[in-house]
Amino acid sequence: MVLKKIKAGISVKIMLLFKHTVELKKHLKQNSNKVVGFVSTMGALHAGHISLISSAKKECDIVVSSIFVNPTQFNDINDLINYPRTFEKDFAMLEDAGCDILFAPEVQEMYSEEELLLKKQNIEDRSWTLGKEIHFGSLEKVMEGAFRPGHFNGVAQVVSKLFNAVQPDKAFLGEKDFQQLAIIRSMTKQMAFAIEIIGCPIVREKNGLAMSS
């Protein structure tokens, strides 16, 4: 059954919200015959993120998005503290875009205390995802990675956890963050996830500046 509500005189589908992996997996298992698309975000959404939702809707039966401000990819604790959190606005944007499911876990749902401690002790190109050690070599040490040591390890770690929770058929990422896209492709291959990684075209501001997604 598809739940709908009336918004501005128009009937729109209600987006489901899950905060726990077990409940999300249980729901998705009931729709195992459907093609699931996934768009991961840290919130503070804009048109670039919504374009990924639109791309996913064109190719998938169910579109899942996530909002999770990932602590393991920040080099500076102040950046983590000051990262914009606009959940209500983000929720409305995703629902209006036709996203079917939002996964918005707390930190405790995604990481154990031991994992957070291990991240603090992380050395150069070593990354632990779902108990498996993976390596990105020089891929994470150039461009943005040269100035943010450990950043892409944190990205790969959280995306692997999100992939494990959602178990999508396809994941949609913006080509603007090209290095991150390459890292996710590498992680997906090393972890043997049966997920198609789809890079989506860059969305730009009116002045030509690329939107980050």
What are these regions (language model features)?
Residues 1-14:
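N-terminal amphipathic/basic-hydrophobic helices that include classical n-h-c signal peptides
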Residues 12-213:
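Nucleotidyltransferase catalytic core that binds NTPs
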